[in-house]
Regions:
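Short glycine/serine/proline-enriched coil/turn segments at secondary-structure junctions
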Residues: 21-23, 67-69, 122
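Short, surface-exposed charged micro-motifs
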Residues: 30-31, 111
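Structural motif
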Residues: 13, 38, 58, 76, ...
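A short mixed-secondary-structure module that forms the rim of ligand-binding clefts
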Residues: 32-68
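Acidic-histidine catalytic/liganding microenvironments
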Residues: 11, 56, 93
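Charged, amphipathic alpha-helical segments
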Residues: 1, 43-46, 94-98
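A short, Trp-centered hydrophobic/proline-enriched beta-strand micro-motif
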Residues: 6-21, 59-63
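Charged, gly/pro-rich active-site loop segments
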Residues: 72-134
Length: 134
């Protein structure tokens, strides 16, 4: 895998860590897309994770791969509440309709993209290396 996006698509469950006051919070995510030269995730505006990202947009993604590799992406996220980004997310992952039956018209569904992110691939057997996002 040559990019962070490829890694996350091949290993679709990853964890998103945020800050809640003075405590770290992590939870599993499963959606990622490359769109308009940006790496996107999505969530629900009513969830604590979104509120935490609004208050402190510095987050980190961590995903485990095969053969003792793992990926970390650290950076800020910004909201893209455009209909086009939401529509693209449902096009790329129709299973999201099980969670958001109204699709891109769901007012609680939100897409976010990384800004200034650094992706690093780690291994138990070799030195860490930076990867392009996509």
């Amino acid at each position: 895998m040559n990019t962070a996006f490829e890694f996350l698509k091949a290993n679709p469950v990853f964890h998103v860590a945020t800050v809640d006051g003075d405590a770290a919070r992590a939870r599993p995510f499963g959606f990622v897309m490359a769109y308009n030269d940006k790496l996107y995730i999505c969530t629900n505006k009513t969830k604590d994770v979104f509120k935490q990202m609004q208050k402190n947009p510095e987050i980190e993604i961590s995903g485990m791969g095969a053969e003792g590799t793992w990926l970390r992406i650290r950076g800020k996220v910004a909201v893209d509440d455009s209909y086009e980004a939401k529509k693209q997310a449902f096009k790329e992952s129709p299973m999201l309709l099980q969670i958001y039956p109204r699709g891109a018209d769901d007012e609680n569904y939100v897409t976010l993209y990384f800004t200034g992110a650094v992706a690093t691939l780690y291994s138990f057997t070799s030195a860490p290396k930076n990867l392009p996002l996509f």
